[in-house]
Amino acid sequence: INLPALAFVPPKPTGKAVLYLHGLSMAEDAKPGGRIEKLMKKQNAIVLSAELRGIGETETGHDKQDYGRGQFGRDVQEIYLAYLTGRSYVGMRTGDVLALTQFLSANLETDGNSGKIHLVGQGEAAIPALHAAALAPEQFESVALDEMIATWAEIVATPESLNQAAS
C-alpha cells in the first residue's frame, strides 16, 4: 500500500527523526508555527508527517461523517472488510507505522545519533502507534500519544464509545 507523507527538513539536520502521525491529515499541524515546525526546530530533526491507511488522502469516497456516525466510527466499512480478510484494521495500520519507521530509518543519516525514531501518534493514529512501539521498542527513542483512550479498561467498562471499532 502506498502511504502519503510530507517531509520537513531543517536547514542543518542533526540526524534525529520524528515520525508524526495525525489522526485526520498529514497537513493538519503543518502550518507555519504549528506543532510540526516546533518539533523540527526544537530537536533540529527531520519530521516525516504521514497518513495511515484510511486517514486523510486515503479515506474512501463515501461520506464518512454520515455513514459511520456514532459508536463505530468513520472507518466501519474498512474495519469490517479487514476482518472479512482475516486481519485486524488496527493491525494493518500498525504495519503501516512499522513500514514508515523502516523507511525513515533507512533514509536517515545518523551522525552518531542512536538512529531511533521519535514517534508521535495523535487521535485515530495513536493506537496503531502504541502497538508499533510495543512490537518494535528497539526502533523508537520516544513515543508520544495524544487524544486517545486513557485505558483499555475504559473501553471494556463502557458498552458504547465513539469510534470504538477503530480501537
Language model features with spans:
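Short beta-strand-to-loop junctions in surface cap/lid or active-site-entrance loops
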Residues: 5-14
